[in-house]
């Protein structure tokens, strides 16, 4: 989840990030962007999964690795549920295939790319104030993506799904 204020071109900023919790194979991390006076311009919360890269499966973080992290207090904000609920009625849009430039070094779609894809369904005058994303499964090169969009007067919700309508990612934007 992320909230923002408008920035000014050339504005000096400081980006900060810190872990605040680990549970099982989940890691929790906050981010802030501050202006030159230390005022918060943007803040975000993220949840990460610790992976065993050889087995390509989630793994518990080791005690040794936990010792390397210095936990800090979580940022004071409203924390959204991890899962984004899909509305029953969504409008299906034209499908498309995953392209090579959307793939990361792990050979699947980079998480930022899902957000960029979802932004394509926003109207031009939609001013994003808050965004959250739920990543459900990895799309790979050549996969076909079936977008489904829901909109009301305050928000847009985009599900980027496979041919069985199972989401790769769900992205929610609020004005």
Q: Which residue stretches match the model-derived regions?
A:
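Short, small-residue-biased leader/transition segments that mark boundaries at the very start
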Residues: 2-4
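HotDog/MaoC-like acyl-thioester-processing domains
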Residues: 8-85, 139-143, 150-175
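Acidic/His-leaning functional-site neighborhoods
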Residues: 90, 94-174
